[in-house]
Design a protein with these regions (language model features):
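TRNA-recognition modules of translation machinery and tRNA-sensing kinases, especially anticodon-binding
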Residues: 1-141
Length: 141
C-alpha cells in the first residue's frame, strides 16, 4: 500500500453534494478570503474519490492507498469522540475481486496485531447489504 494525503481544506460542495445529513450538520465550514465556501475535511472518502477521478487513467490498477488523515467534525464531544481526530483509511481501487476485500481485512488484522492486540482483544464482523436485502426480500415474499 502506498501512503497518500489530501488537503485538509476542501470546497464545501465536495461534502454537501453527496454526504449524509449528519456529516453536513457537523462541518466546520466558512468563506475564505477569496470568497470561496470551504470546509475542513470531516472524512476522507470524498477527497480520495476526487483525487482518483481526476487522474484515474494515469494510475496503474489496482490502486492500493492508505492514509491516516486529520479530520474535523463539529459534534458533541464525549469520551473517544473528539472534534479533531485521526483515522486510518485503506482502500483498493480498480479491483472488484473478493480477494481485495480479504486483503483489506488481513491488513486490518496486521495493524491491530502491531498494537500488540491478539484474537482475544477484537472481533471482526463481516456483512453484506446485498445479502441481507436478498434475504429480506425472499423471506417477505
Amino acid at each position: 500500500f502506498q501512503a497518500y494525503d489530501g488537503p485538509p481544506l476542501e470546497p464545501l460542495d465536495l461534502y454537501t453534494a453527496k454526504s449524509g445529513e449528519e456529516i453536513v450538520g457537523q462541518l466546520y465550514n466558512f468563506t475564505d478570503k477569496g470568497e470561496r465556501a470551504v470546509s475542513m475535511r470531516p472524512e476522507m472518502t470524498p477527497t480520495v474519490a476526487r483525487m482518483i477521478a481526476a487522474r484515474e487513467r494515469h494510475y496503474k490498477k489496482p490502486i492500493k492507498w492508505y492514509s491516516i488523515p486529520q479530520l474535523f467534525r463539529y459534534e458533541r464531544q464525549q469520551k473517544g469522540r473528539l472534534r479533531e481526530h485521526f483515522q486510518f483509511n485503506a482502500d483498493i481501487f480498480g479491483e472488484n475481486d473478493p480477494a481485495s476485500d480479504a486483503e483489506l481485512i488481513a491488513l486490518l488484522i496486521d495493524v491491530l496485531r502491531s498494537f500488540d492486540l491478539s484474537a482475544e482483544d477484537f472481533v471482526i464482523r463481516l456483512s453484506s447489504r446485498n445479502a441481507w436485502q436478498y434475504f429480506a426480500n425472499n423471506k417477505i415474499n
